[in-house]
């Protein structure tokens, strides 16, 4: 069962999530698969995220408070957006066991 993510994410919350992840705007934009100018508009409140970037932001917001994910953020590779996205998705979806037929 999937939960639909809708609504707006305030600019201050996006900035707070980025800073908690320890990423620059450029790194965070690559992490979310958007341009620097798009992220800049979100953080300035001139536009709002939707679709996949919004889903990733919501996942990251939830994971930031967990100890295991805090350890991921301390890893020197965490400034690499690909590494961070992989670890985020793996920590969210990677532990499920496949259903037996």
What are these regions (language model features)?
Residues 1-20, 58:
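A short, Lys/Arg-rich alpha-helix, primarily the initiator
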Residues 3, 66-101:
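Short, charged recognition helix plus adjacent turn
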Residues 10-13, 20, 36, 82, ...:
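Coiled-coil-like amphipathic alpha-helices with heptad-repeat character
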Residues 13, 38-41, 56:
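Residue-level recognition of specific faces of alpha-helices
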Residues 22-41:
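Short alpha-helical DNA-recognition segment
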Residues 46-59:
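Short, basic-rich loop-to-helix N-cap that marks the start of a DNA-contacting helix
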